[in-house]
């Protein structure tokens, strides 16, 4: 409040995760202290009341799993009233963080933040990105700004359009349309409303899917059966990565780069991911692969500790190129 703080330069680096490269801007440690306090004490208390419950990103008690769980609940709610009639609209935005308008953010600060000095801090964080567009990934106030930015669109979908089952995780949206309404008209209205916020919908990634067919949301595949059961399967590419990792772990064990305790943690972390889905067959196949390579079951930690104490290395599996 003494007007001595000015945001410093970010540390820029790229992060490649699952084939997607992202540019990350990390703040200095002295700026992180201000960012964290400002986000928790100012931004979130101001923005949270206008957010819908199904906005599941980076909020306490919510997150990636929350968004998938809410979609499953909405599918069950829809089935009890309409069966498998109707459709689901899946929407994704182009360059969600890099393309957001600074003018829209500053207008929101003007509307909600009454104290001039506090508003100046919020404006200074936005101004760290030149060009009048974009917010940095990796900065906590930026994350809070972008979580709340589509709230006008969210409330338009829920209130003006009267859609009960709708939600999103950051820029990944789902909108469940009853059978008595036109999904193309709903999608057109949503795209127009997003355009008024200067958000661009990626038409190549957005689509309308009948609820009788499977669809993907948040890296998971969903299917509503004829009995109303919601089947959720994990990402198929994750199985390929898991198999490569398990094979690589054997080489690390042989070379002494990995302990059996670390092997227990890593393998069961992989299995736990698929156990959270309706993926029993995939879990079973991964356990069989582990047994073929290491010669013991991955379920019990005693198996790992016993071999770690004996410094044993075993392989009954023939790798194929």
Language-model segments: which ranges?
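Right-hand nucleic-acid polymerase module
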Residues: 1, 27, 32, 36, ...
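A common structural junction motif
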Residues: 113, 191-199
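Conserved polymerase palm-domain catalytic core
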Residues: 74-170, 174-189, 209, 260, ...
């Amino acid at each position: 409040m003494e007007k001595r703080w000015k945001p410093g330069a970010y540390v820029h680096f790229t992060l490649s995760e699952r084939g997607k490269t992202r540019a990350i801007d990390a703040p200095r440690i002295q700026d992180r202290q201000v960012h964290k306090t400002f986000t928790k004490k100012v931004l979130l208390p101001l923005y949270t009341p206008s957010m819908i419950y199904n906005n599941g990103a980076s909020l306490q008690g919510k997150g990636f799993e929350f968004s998938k769980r809410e979609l499953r609940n909405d599918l069950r709610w829809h089935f009890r009233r309409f069966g498998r009639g109707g459709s689901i609209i899946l929407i994704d935005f182009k360059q969600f963080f890099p393309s957001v308008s600074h003018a829209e953010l500053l207008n929101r600060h003007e509307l909600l933040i009454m104290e001039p000095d506090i508003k100046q801090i919020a404006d200074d964080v936005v101004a760290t990105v030149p060009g009048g567009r974009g917010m940095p990934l990796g900065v906590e106030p930026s994350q809070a700004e972008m979580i709340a930015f589509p709230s006008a669109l969210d409330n338009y979908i829920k209130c003006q359009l009267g859609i009960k089952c709708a939600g999103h995780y950051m820029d990944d949206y789902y909108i469940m349309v009853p059978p008595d309404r036109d999904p193309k008209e709903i999608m057109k209205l949503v795209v127009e409303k997003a355009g008024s916020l200067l958000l661009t919908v990626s038409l190549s990634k957005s689509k309308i899917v009948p609820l009788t067919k499977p669809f993907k949301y948040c890296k998971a595949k969903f299917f509503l059966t004829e009995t109303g059961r919601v089947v959720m399967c994990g990402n198929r590419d994750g199985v390929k990565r898991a198999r490569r990792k398990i094979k690589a772990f054997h080489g690390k064990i042989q070379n002494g780069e990995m302990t059996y305790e670390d092997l227990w943690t890593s393998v069961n972390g992989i299995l736990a991911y698929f156990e959270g889905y309706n993926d029993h067959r995939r879990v079973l196949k991964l356990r069989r692969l582990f047994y073929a390579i290491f010669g013991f079951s991955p379920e019990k930690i005693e198996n790992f500790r016993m071999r770690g104490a004996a410094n044993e290395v075993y392989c009954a599996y023939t790798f194929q190129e």
